[in-house]
């Protein structure tokens, strides 16, 4: 029998970092289209986003594992949103000390120090919902089989309709 193991925290951090980076690029491209009708959809971000999103989503994963049986979904998403604001402010504040903060929300009506803005509350809430329901839950289901050979799945763990066979 194969020895499939859950992904390590570093592996999950990597997946979360890539996911956050991709979403940041897509969000900025969509924002550019909605605000400026730019059909080029130029999405931008910073390499700092890899660390910021990877770490933040890994912490949200820990929150999810502790809260999932105790808190309703919408309350968890509110908690994740508050965490996101705290994390965005903290990382932005630190990066600003080195003139390296890649965002500036000063032009928004409800910004605080240009580092966070209330206008993003709904997108952050929706993002938290999607992260919990799809990204974290599916990432926690992934397994690493250290004995598997590269290539197509075969044997007892061959895929059948997207599900792992266990018989």
UniProtKB/Swiss-Prot annotation:
InterPro entries noted in UniProt: CmpB_TMEM229
All ranges on the Extracellular side of the membrane: 36-40, 95-111
Subcellular location: Membrane
Record has Metal-binding as a keyword: no
Source organism superkingdom: Eukaryota
Xref: Pfam families: ABC_trans_CmpB
Ranges facing Cytoplasmic side: 1-14, 62-73, 133-167
Sequence intervals crossing the membrane: 15-35, 41-61, 74-94, 112-132
Membrane-topology descriptor: Multi-pass membrane protein
A GO cellular-component term linked to this record: membrane
Alphabetic keyword roster: Membrane, Transmembrane, Transmembrane helix
Keyword presence, Methyltransferase: no
GO BP: macrophage activation; response to bacterium
Family: Belongs to the TMEM229 family.
The protein, known as: Transmembrane protein 229B
Organism the protein comes from: Bos taurus
Gene that produces this protein: TMEM229B
């Amino acid at each position: 029998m194969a020895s499939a193991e859950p992904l390590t925290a570093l592996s999950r951090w990597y997946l979360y970092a890539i996911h956050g980076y991709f979403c940041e690029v897509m969000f900025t491209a969509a924002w550019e289209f909605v605000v400026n009708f730019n059909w080029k959809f130029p999405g931008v971000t910073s390499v700092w986003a890899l660390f910021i999103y990877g770490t933040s989503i890994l912490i949200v994963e820990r929150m999810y594992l502790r809260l999932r049986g105790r808190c309703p979904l919408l309350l968890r998403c509110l908690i994740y949103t508050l965490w996101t604001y705290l994390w965005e402010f903290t990382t932005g504040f630190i990066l600003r000390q080195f003139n390296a903060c890649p965002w500036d929300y000063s032009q928004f009506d409800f910004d605080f120090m240009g580092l966070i803005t209330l206008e993003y509350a709904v997108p952050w809430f929706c993002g938290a919902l999607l992260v919990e329901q799809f990204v974290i839950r599916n990432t926690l289901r992934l397994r690493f089989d250290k004995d598997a050979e590269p290539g197509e799945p075969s044997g007892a763990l061959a895929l059948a309709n997207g599900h792992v066979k266990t018989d």
